[in-house]
């Protein structure tokens, strides 16, 4: 997937970048707390992924003319701006990283490489109804996995099962949106519209609450 920055609305934007291309970029924009976190990452690939995601969210913020506030993770593992303003979601796969920001609403984003093993793992994250229309197709299974990950990130709480609490409506390979809902979770049911972009062997999904 190519590097891109897209303004969704005056309130929201997302960015996708190549992790390796960002390797020499300055990290002076990071908060002191983030610089400490980055210094404690020892694995080279993990360092590149972490950096790539921060560079992506910086680009998204610049698109809607917002300064980089720094980010931290809560006890659910969800990232938040340190100034308490807005909502963010980060993701990476292979050599790509992506991030989305919205000034007012929760967001979720996910990048996935199309993989055969998503079919084998299907019973762990898919309802029987979903497996019927996905027809053992790795492309469709990866779309479903990514859409559910995006919804999971947007709702932002642990204890939500991809299989039991997130249900997707039928979709096709050429679908540019996927409808899904969180239900029977102990929290209020909520419907999501997940946007889908496909390029070569990579699937990008994102949603806004």
Predicted stretch roles:
Residues 1-209:
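Core catalytic alpha/beta fold that binds nucleotide/phospho-ligands
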């Amino acid at each position: 997937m190519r590097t891109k920055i897209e303004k969704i609305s005056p309130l929201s934007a997302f960015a996708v970048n190549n992790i390796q291309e960002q390797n020499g970029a300055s990290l002076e924009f990071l908060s002191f707390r983030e610089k400490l976190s980055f210094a404690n990452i020892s694995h080279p690939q993990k360092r590149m992924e972490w950096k790539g995601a921060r560079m992506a969210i910086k680009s998204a913020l610049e698109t809607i003319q917002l300064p980089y506030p720094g980010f931290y993770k809560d006890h659910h593992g969800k990232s938040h701006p340190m100034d308490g303003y807005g909502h963010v979601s980060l993701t990476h796969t292979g050599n790509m990283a992506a991030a989305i920001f919205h000034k007012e609403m929760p967001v979720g984003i996910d990048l996935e490489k199309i993989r055969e093993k998503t079919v084998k793992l299907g019973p762990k994250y898919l309802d029987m109804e979903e497996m019927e229309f996905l027809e053992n197709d790795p492309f469709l299974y990866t779309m479903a996995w990514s859409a559910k990950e995006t919804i999971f990130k947007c709702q932002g709480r642990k204890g939500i099962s991809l299989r039991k609490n997130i249900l997707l409506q039928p979709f096709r390979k050429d679908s540019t949106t996927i409808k899904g809902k969180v239900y029977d979770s102990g929290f209020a049911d909520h419907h999501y519209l997940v946007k889908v972009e496909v390029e070569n062997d990579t699937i990008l999904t994102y949603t806004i609450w």
